[in-house]
């Protein structure tokens, strides 16, 4: 069994706030949610209040169930005690809110039902593993079971009296013991799960095993440990096929059968994955925090958005996980415009018109005809992608091959704009492709977080002389996928002047040579039904 250990990070504004829906301009009107203050049109978010970590996505009895950290009392993480919100869907696009699945009502979770996971047991009964904060504020691990597994909506959950199933370990410090993973069944008939903990100052992924899902014993050695961070938030462990894009059930075992296992670790708490029986794919969720001010979130009455669900698979060389929006998103595509064989010369700016660019899906392939002549030298000291994106990758800068890409959510005078782009460097006869999202000019507001994020894209641009970019634009949410999903950047923007009806979309090139747009397709996206009052009837009828 081989382990891949990617480390993911998120960037967020830690200022969280509260208000009631009664004063919020985004409250439902005649069952429909109004798009104000950056509310998205086709991404998952509750009708009101706070959400964060995805916690137990599963596919059961023909429906997708999504559970998530939810404050049913306001859009604030640290006031109130978190519950698990529960929504269902028939297509991963349109969602109905079912209320809360579990709430902090017992001594072992009275201070909050924190993050965890869902596992479907033998016989088909779903179970939650989750962290509770007990009456003393101590983090312990608990279990809850679906009361009626035959109920397609899984409305009722019960907590056995034997909770907590894992008490706080003696060698764990600083109350860092949380986030149990989806369990997997080994060939020895034992269930196993991973729990994040701080042991001797290091972040550790502790392994526990059980025969009955109620009594758990800890393995002597952790699955992984790192002194770089005190706790590895929300670990995840799952198999992927070495060949092809099919997902695998969590209990699939390697053993030389073309399976690799992935241990996903994070310095922050962002991701959750699940396997979809019948479709043979692994789907990933990603929480994206707000970057705006306390006053903004108090006024709008909600906080937190989920990225659009992504399928996850291993690339052909077996070295990298790829991410891509699930195919169901294409059902939202409506009006289409396109470009083909268009030159964008040095300093060029080409507007894409004909679609509502604040709610769009854009796919583009760029060709670089003069790669060898134009690429700048790469400095080996440029090891920090975040710093490189700020210092060398700014969209307004001029370089050799790039920056080139898309400008999205732009005002007519370009005073506000967000750039998603590539830049290519040369180092010892090889080429390094850098991808960046630059928020520094995304808004004229002074009280929103505006930074630049970047990463290297593992592609052989010397061979192909081209690179692809896909960007999902949904008002305050921008998701970009470079090189077919080899690099992904997700962020939030809050423009004042590039409103829903007045935003602009451009292809740009600030490099010294010409870049060709070999193909561009942009689709206007319909508005999904997400947690509004009339969603459940439509979902259960379908």
UniProtKB/Swiss-Prot annotation:
EC number of the protein: 3.2.1.26
One example GO MF annotation: beta-fructofuranosidase activity
Compartments in which it is found: Secreted, Extracellular space, Apoplast; Secreted, Cell wall
Catalytic function, reaction form: Hydrolysis of terminal non-reducing beta-D-fructofuranoside residues in beta-D-fructofuranosides
Annotated tissue distribution: Expressed in roots and leaves.
Record-annotated membrane-spanning stretches: none
Positions annotated as active site in the UniProt record: 53
GO terms of biological process kind: carbohydrate metabolic process
Top-rank lineage group of the source organism: Eukaryota
GO CC terms, sorted: apoplast
Disulfide-linked positions: 389-436
Inducing or repressing factors: By rice blast fungus (M.grisea) 48 hours after infection. Down-regulated by sucrose in excised leaves.
Binding site for substrate: 50-53, 69, 77, 114-115, 178-179, 233
Key words of the record: Apoplast, Cell wall, Disulfide bond, Glycoprotein, Glycosidase, Hydrolase, Secreted
Function as written in the Swiss-Prot or TrEMBL entry: May play a role in stress response.
Entries under PANTHER family matching the protein: BETA-FRUCTOFURANOSIDASE, INSOLUBLE ISOENZYME CWINV1-RELATED
Family of this protein: Belongs to the glycosyl hydrolase 32 family.
Annotated protein name in UniProt: Beta-fructofuranosidase, insoluble isoenzyme 5
């Amino acid at each position: 069994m081989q382990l891949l250990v990617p480390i993911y990070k998120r960037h967020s504004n830690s200022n969280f706030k509260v208000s009631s829906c009664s004063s919020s301009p985004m409250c439902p009107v005649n069952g429909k949610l109004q798009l104000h203050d950056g509310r998205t049109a086709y991404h998952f978010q509750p009708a009101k209040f706070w959400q964060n970590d995805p916690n137990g996505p599963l596919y059961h009895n023909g429906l997708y169930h999504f559970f998530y950290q939810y404050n049913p009392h306001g859009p604030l993480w640290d006031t109130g005690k978190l519950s698990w919100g529960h929504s269902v869907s028939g297509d991963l696009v349109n969602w109905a809110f079912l209320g809360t699945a579990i709430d902090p009502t017992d001594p072992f979770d009275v201070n909050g039902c924190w993050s965890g996971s869902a596992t479907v047991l033998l016989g088909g009964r779903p179970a939650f593993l989750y962290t509770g904060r007990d009456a003393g504020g101590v983090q312990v691990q608990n279990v809850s079971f679906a009361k009626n597994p035959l109920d397609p909506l899984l409305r009722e959950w019960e907590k056995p009296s034997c909770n907590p199933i894992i008490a706080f370990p003696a060698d764990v410090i600083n109350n860092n013991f949380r986030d149990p993973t989806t369990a997997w069944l080994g060939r020895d008939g034992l269930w196993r799960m991973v729990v994040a903990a701080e042991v001797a100052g290091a972040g550790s992924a502790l392994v526990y095993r059980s025969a009955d899902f109620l009594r758990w014993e800890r393995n002597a050695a952790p699955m992984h440990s790192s002194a770089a961070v005190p706790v590895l938030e929300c670990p995840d462990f799952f198999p992927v096929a070495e060949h092809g894009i099919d997902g695998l059930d969590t209990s699939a075992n390697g053993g030389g059968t073309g399976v690799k296992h992935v241990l996903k670790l994070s310095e922050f708490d962002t991701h959750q994955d699940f396997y979809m029986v019948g479709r043979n794919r692994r789907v990933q969720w990603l929480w994206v925090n707000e970057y705006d001010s306390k006053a903004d979130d108090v006024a709008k009455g909600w906080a937190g958005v989920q990225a659009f669900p992504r399928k996850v698979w291993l690339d052909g060389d077996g070295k990298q996980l790829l991410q891509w929006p699930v195919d169901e998103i294409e059902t939202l595509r409506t009006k289409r415009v396109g470009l083909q064989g268009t030159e964008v010369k040095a300093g060029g700016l080409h507007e894409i018109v004909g679609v509502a660019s604040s709610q769009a899906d854009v796919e583009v392939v760029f060709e670089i005809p003069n790669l060898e002549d134009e690429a700048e030298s790469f400095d080996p000291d440029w090891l920090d992608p975040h710093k490189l994106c700020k210092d060398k990758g700014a969209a307004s800068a001029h370089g050799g091959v790039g920056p080139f890409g898309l400008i999205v959510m732009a005002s007519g005078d370009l005073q506000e704009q967000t750039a998603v782009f590539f830049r290519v460097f040369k180092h010892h006869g090889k080429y390094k492709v850098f991808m960046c999202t630059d928020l520094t000019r995304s808004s004229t507001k002074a009280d929103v977080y505006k930074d630049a994020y970047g990463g290297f894209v593992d592609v052989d641009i010397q061979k192909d002389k081209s690179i692809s970019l896909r960007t999902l634009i949904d008002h305050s949410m921008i998701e970009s996928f470079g090189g077919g999903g080899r690099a992904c950047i997700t962020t939030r923007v809050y423009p004042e002047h590039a409103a829903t009806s007045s935003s602009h979309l451009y292809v740009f090139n600030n490099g010294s040579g010409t870049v060709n747009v070999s193909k561009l397709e942009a689709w206007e996206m319909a508005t999904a039904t997400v947690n509004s009052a009339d969603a459940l009837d439509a979902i259960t009828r379908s």
